[in-house]
């Protein structure tokens, strides 16, 4: 099951948590908003008929793609994606027990956070994809766009206009 970034069904829940904004801001640098996936994960657990089990896996699109390419051998993400969940502490660079508890997200269900560069697994044989192809590098779309637009110098900036503007 998946809920995309534009989905606002958790707006009321984020409103209920308004008093927690200082904690969320301090841990994540984010505002409480349904754009981020923490409240969506909570929604799936509460309303989406997703049972908590030892095998539960909750992640972002990168972790889902890698998990599928490796047939479940690698369940990973990087900080650029984890930091957009409202569950990742950008100071400690780990999942936050406080934020996971606030949203009712079991920490065992979250992917391992790894470096953005480096090998994270290899493909398993599947329809049209041979086994053993290295999977290297993870980055969120806008973080990757920074490199794609050659912003390599301090002070460089970029702007992307599409379904969202960043």
Each PLM stretch: what is its role?
Residues 47-53, 68, 97-107:
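Phosphate/pyrophosphate-binding loops at sites that engage ATP/ADP/AMP, CoA/4′-phosphopantetheine
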Residues 1-4, 26, 54, 128-134:
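N-terminal glycine/serine-rich phosphate-binding loop of ATP-dependent small-molecule kinases
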Residues 1-41, 141:
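Active-site phosphate-binding/coordination module
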């Amino acid at each position: 099951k998946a809920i995309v970034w534009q989905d606002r069904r958790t707006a009321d829940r984020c409103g209920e948590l308004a008093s927690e904004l200082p904690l969320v801001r301090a841990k994540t640098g984010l505002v409480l908003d349904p754009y981020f996936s923490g409240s969506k994960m909570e929604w799936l657990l509460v309303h989406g008929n997703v049972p908590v089990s030892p095998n539960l896996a909750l992640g972002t699109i990168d972790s889902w793609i890698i998990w599928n390419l490796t047939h479940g051998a690698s369940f990973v993400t990087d900080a650029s994606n984890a930091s957009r969940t409202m569950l990742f502490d950008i100071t400690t660079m780990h999942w936050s027990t406080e934020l996971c508890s606030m949203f009712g997200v079991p920490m065992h269900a979250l992917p391992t956070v790894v470096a953005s560069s480096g090998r994270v697994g290899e493909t398993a044989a599947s329809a049209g994809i041979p086994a053993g192809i290295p999977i290297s590098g993870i980055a969120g779309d806008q973080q990757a766009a920074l490199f794609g637009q050659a912003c390599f110098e301090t002070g460089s900036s970029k702007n992307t206009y599409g379904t969202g503007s960043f």
